[in-house]
């Protein structure tokens, strides 16, 4: 929150390295583990669609109304309801550190492959990560890629600084 070029570049790398026919940006109303989002759902959907409109394989969707939830487990169950999709759940190494706090995180890892991209300053911390120790290498795929030193929180700070 907000989407940025780092998200887009990671998506392009994932499409190529995982040979994906489609990649979905599942934009949620609110992350249950974070404070209220800076931009509302409608604005984040607009920004995400605008950012990804030149990459045919990226689709931007919100499942909150369909699943009546913002929880990842409900989105994944909804996606798998009528077909045997192979789902890759993509996250940065910063999110993997707190993955054990997510609702039904072990079930998420059983329903899909967790794909992790490096974030500056986080890879060494994963040595003691609960999710890494618990799930092991068969459930988590680390993808090497160029590290993009950009963060949504820095973008929000700069936005506020120049907004006023």
Predicted regions and their residues:
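Nucleotidyltransferase catalytic core that binds NTPs
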Residues: 1-164
